[in-house]
């Protein structure tokens, strides 16, 4: 197998691939152009979206030529893949702003040049519908489209005609990228398999060119939960939506059974180093988790920020060091207040989702103020509790928050 493909396989990226042997031989002979697409449905991607772009970075290191397709036009329709209901229709301004943000985010993470980024509005916005149906639609079988899981699952919930067109447009994207950039490979999540296959078929019928598709497994944690979800919601790559400290802690709290898998997927460490540190036992495995958290934080937010939150994490858990990057909640006593009920402060700061959960944690001995266990549900804080205008609140073993006046 080609070196780059073999690397993707070893690191757990490879789920399905069309004509793997032919693609491998082609990549041995020449450096190919390949692409992954992303729609502008949000102002930020989350960690679950990152897999294709990490794979792109690996392929780029082997000399292959990446294209990131920003689907600003296809966002107007919405991809039905993996969805049980129609996506919210966004305004043109929202889509434009999201596309701008996502491009900047991915350019910062991947370090790809601007010429690697293309918007599909370049060709989709000016399509003539009648001509598109005649020249492109004729090559699609409705029966075959309905056989793909993307549409089969949605038929039970309702599938709009606008969404039914999505596969044609994504296929046309691949066709256009092959035409203008000689793109030979599309990569994406395994839920995109049907769309990718349709694009390959369209190019073969329209241009007589063999192209390829490669998909990645949809990443889940060992507890069965989808990768990229936390108690605070999606683990966004934008620090204004999900703090860098919380991002680091999300990976620092990886379960033991996921450490090796995530080191292969979310870092660029060499195989022998991953094998060494992922085989640590007991408390030593925490070192592997710290390495994992640091490496992926460095990729997404840069080394300087990764060092800051690593130091803050060490300070929180080991009791020494720079604590300034531990997340904080700004609080002020009202003029009439002499004290504040801790349970209310816990809810306001969102360190607990409800008062009942806060009471349960206090009763179980899981809440600490400045390292001292809170014994009473009705515990109150006064100004005197705030040394240097702050206190440190710990909930459970892993949640730390500075309350700052």
Swiss-Prot record:
Database matches in InterPro entries: aa-tRNA-synth_Ic, Rossmann-like_a/b/a_fold, S4_RNA-bd, S4_RNA-bd_sf, SYY-like_C, Tyr-tRNA-ligase, Tyr-tRNA-ligase_bac-type, Tyr-tRNA-ligase_bac_1
Major localization class: cytoplasm
GO biological process: tyrosyl-tRNA aminoacylation
Intervals of motif 'KMSKS' region: 226-230
The protein, known as: Tyrosine--tRNA ligase
Chain sites annotated for binding L-tyrosine: 35, 166, 170
Intrachain disulfide bonds: none
GO function terms (MF aspect): ATP binding; RNA binding; tyrosine-tRNA ligase activity
Residue numbers covered by motif 'HIGH' region: 40-49
Catalysed reaction equations from the record: tRNA(Tyr) + L-tyrosine + ATP = L-tyrosyl-tRNA(Tyr) + AMP + diphosphate + H(+)
Superkingdom in the source lineage: Bacteria
Entries under PANTHER family matching the protein: TYROSINE--TRNA LIGASE, MITOCHONDRIAL, TYROSYL-TRNA SYNTHETASE
NCBIfam families the record matches: tyrS (TIGR00234)
Keyword RNA-binding: yes
Protein localization: Cytoplasm
Keyword field: Aminoacyl-tRNA synthetase, ATP-binding, Cytoplasm, Ligase, Nucleotide-binding, Protein biosynthesis, RNA-binding
GO cellular component terms given for this protein: cytosol
Functional description taken from the UniProt entry: Catalyzes the attachment of tyrosine to tRNA(Tyr) in a two-step reaction: tyrosine is first activated by ATP to form Tyr-AMP and then transferred to the acceptor end of tRNA(Tyr).
Entry EC number(s): 6.1.1.1
Family of the protein in this entry: Belongs to the class-I aminoacyl-tRNA synthetase family. TyrS type 1 subfamily.
UniProt-annotated binding residues for ATP: 229
Domain S4 RNA-binding, residue spans: 340-404
The keyword NAD belongs to this UniProt entry's keyword annotation: no
Subunit: Homodimer.
